Amino acid sequence: MDDINALSRLALRKKLPLHVDCCLGSFLVPCLEKAGFETQPFDFRLKGVTSISCDTHKYGFAPKGNSTVLYRTAELRQYQYYVCPDWSGGVYASPGIAGSRPGALIAGCWASLMTVGESGYVDACVKIVGTAKKIVDAIQTSGSLSGELQIMGKPLVSVVAFTALNLNIYDIADAMSAKGWHLNALQDPPAIHVAVTLPITRVWDRLVKDLETVVEEEREKERVRQVEGKGAKGKAMGNSAALYGVAGSLPNKSVVVDLANGFLDILYKA
């Protein structure tokens, strides 16, 4: 978590609005205290916070495609509206640029919130955050992991990010993907993270075991390369290593933007 308390004070001092992107942790962070975990203030209790975004389709367990944004005042909310008073079809007013939205998504969201309820979200927080802490502890204490992997920052909620001290972290990501664990690659610095979900709470020990196996395998590959006098240059790279390795080495990120645009163009081809 970012230090929202400090950012709030800064926003007040500079007389600027402060938006809190709480899309990922919105149904976990408010439950941390009731679940018995360490927490930090992040919401409208901080005077500098003017708006908060919250994804109901993530840890809110609602259908994909809906999200919410909260404003401190109704006056601030009006800036998201789109109003066209001189349209030929009459006055057009919409809550946002997106225009028409399916009512089924709202109904599905409401049903999810009512079914799970506050107690259900607190229980999910206990399981999810508790599992994240188990994964952190395993990485920091495992004989095969503690000397090779390093936890990034201080995970307070569900996301555990880590990097490798001697190995290529993206090779580890590709090897984990081959075992069915699709972890998210990060850059600046190179790292990967796992966002713990309810299904992972039931198999987290298997994830750690597979991670131990992968690290041992990558360490052995590196040892063989060194014995044979081969460096990392010229070795076969997996998808993550190739993509993030190249992206991280390019001083001009406009090339990366062009590559991403080309990828998106392909998605539109019939």
Model-derived regions: residue spans:
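Active-site C-terminal subdomain of aminotransferase-like
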Residues: 1, 19, 31-158, 162-167
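Catalytic PLP-binding core of fold-type I/II PLP enzymes
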Residues: 1-33
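Short, well-ordered alpha-helical packing segments
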Residues: 4-11, 50-53, 136, 173, ...
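Short, solvent-exposed amphipathic alpha-helical segments in soluble enzyme
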Residues: 5-9, 69-70, 85-86, 177-178, ...
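Glycine-rich beta-alpha junction loops
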Residues: 24, 58, 198-200
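Residue-level "edge-of-site" marker
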Residues: 24, 156, 189
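Short loop/turn segments at secondary-structure transitions that flank enzyme active sites
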Residues: 26, 75-77, 200
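Non-catalytic terminal extensions of PLP-dependent enzymes
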Residues: 122, 131, 141, 146, ...
